[in-house]
């Protein structure tokens, strides 16, 4: 841990009642308890900033930087006044889909909601019971919690913990006269989308899947066991015809997003232009408030579900699209929420660096490991990279054509 790191989670010992609830509920055993004194402290090396301990503390002795109780309540109040919406949709980072997907998920559950307040969180299990009642007091009539399926929770026990809280909250709300539909839980886990008509049966996805979710078939295209798929994106990278992709992170959609951003910013004579590919678990603020990057550093953030889903083709293509530098931000091996198959991602980066070196572009790409436990770490590394790229001349490359072997057809 960096000595200059400002911890995102702290226990206020003056408020702590030594009840040890946080110690017993932490899914990462990141809270140490002294058996003699009962004093509890957070081990920042193990903490994943899921916030479950924060929401469980009965005396609010735990301070947290991201998505604190007052901040969440203020956000709901502001959005309610701005949109007039009476529906609050809570989403875990692991399953928080694009806007269109939210509506699709709700419709599949028989819920038709045209206007809602989206609230994205590191884990749905961190929602305090008090916040549910606060949201209702602020004018919310319906709360929908889109949670990961139990076995796919990125914070181990987060979904189970939240399910228990929701059950207790619903029981209490009904006793107070609220409708049974006031609080609803929807289970959703991001998976791959498989278009078998595009598949040529090369079976690359079978060999690359670190979770054994894809099985080769003797006289047919591979079979995906969706009950095992975790949506890491490793298979999507090796598919030569984009027959298999992670829902919400389709290759062409990502390509269009950064290409159009580069075109717009170039027209405004912005320099330098920085593109950040960011694992959704390594950094919170940049992804949940992407406008801050554009305003402060002229940087665009593109979210990826995991380090394994960082496509080297996108790095090369983004430089051809007009960006002066590309920065990748991922979790360390110890912090990765999807640890299986990390060696594949590292090999991809080695190949990428070799290609960039041959193109004399290696200095315009950096890979950093970052954790949300250390406040400001991402901004520090972005500043360093920004200054480095700013010291170079603007990058002027010919726009890559479709025949380029690096570009997927």
Regions found by a protein language model. Give the residues of each.
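Peripheral docking tails and interdomain loops at the edges
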Residues: 175-191, 197, 358-406
